[in-house]
């Protein structure tokens, strides 16, 4: 045998030194579990070696073995430890399994479970309620609304609480397709949609919330009426058991729609603006994304001008109550047996309170009276037997132009309720006055409201926060109206029933004042979004082929959608005549 070359001799010696493993291949098999005398966990290919070992973490389910990958990803995220893929030699001995152990008892269990078979967890869709009765319409007449006892009723088309009957049956129901998107109650529309109405546009609240138009603070065009001084004694803390009663003061107040306003008609003839509206109507449109109750606005186009109007005794004439509450007040068709706490009754009560509260908190002193440039345009002393209410009508103009080439202006009639002296410089401050009313904090539909008599003084912030939640749309509208009028202070009164079971006797628990813009910031109210909505709706009407057309903007009663219809000439007049006939039939039936 020839001797191997010097380069291969070292390799041959290395191979000869390897142990003889027979038919196997690879390193020798060993059962040693120590490394230099230190025990260690065996290596597993399932372990991730990209992190430090955490020897202090325990497995979540009390087991050392890894579960399925899906279970690990769902429940054991960020809890993986090195060596978790193999059985640990440090695991304590398994205790005796006692899962099969049980105690036999012959005592009959009579306890009842809270949620038994067929328990109802959600309210189902209820039946459709009937239409509410409409109050007498005033037509185009400039009739005033009495704000005191014995005045005209504040009827209207308010239908805020109409909806489905609460499901109180014994059987539960299963969720179906898009049950989350179905309304909890079925309300009726504020106006009957006829078949010959043409649908122009359908806008949901998501699109409305994205609209934006920056504008200036506006300028005064003219002002009418007069103002009495605000009584600052109402700002003082109320002494317990010494609250002031809300008095029914008979004063002439007016709520004339846009196209019937003689001042707006004169401004339209002078081409002072393209869009005309009142603060009551404009605030509803600007706060549309917050509204829940159904409403409608009549829009008239005359040439290149747009008039935002309201129907007589429509929903806009009434002050809603707990419209935005999670469980709003129920109507009679929904099973409510408490007549004074139904939506329409609460709205009439709130409207009555607001009119009388504004008249009561002013001092009717001629020496402190502030007269505007012109007299009240709606008051006629020869026809009225009561004095006019303290009210100033300011006609203000806003620039809604989107380009320098084409200018678009809006004129709005705003209202101021009182005037007060600034404590610093003694200048007059314009004041708007509104009132929140407490009816029954323990009744259905109260929305978790606190007891004002015990909490208003100590937890005023919590009371206001609850009202912002339950009456978001109403408070937003009042704030917008104050900003449109360029008021310096917005006064909010807190009025409660003397007895929760009686809705015609009230007491004033306190008054709080805010700067309108500060209050808007607290409510996250963006006026630029409201101006964007107004300009968008006006542009849709101006795109119509007819220069003399009428439109109706309707809030869907059960969805967060606005629909714009173009209506034939005379369609709304026919409906008004039908309402008059219904009223006459009702009066004859009562007789």
Curated annotation (Swiss-Prot):
Species annotation: Neurospora crassa (strain ATCC 24698 / 74-OR23-1A / CBS 708.71 / DSM 1257 / FGSC 987)
Biased composition (Basic and acidic residues): 55-67
Location in the cell: Cytoplasm
Region annotation RNA gate: where it falls in the sequence: 315-329
Pfam families for the chain: eIF-3_zeta
Domain of life of the source: Eukaryota
Subunit architecture: Component of the eukaryotic translation initiation factor 3 (eIF-3) complex.
Protein name: Eukaryotic translation initiation factor 3 subunit D
Region (Disordered): 55-74, 122-181
Record-stated family: Belongs to the eIF-3 subunit D family.
Single Gene Ontology MF annotation: mRNA cap binding
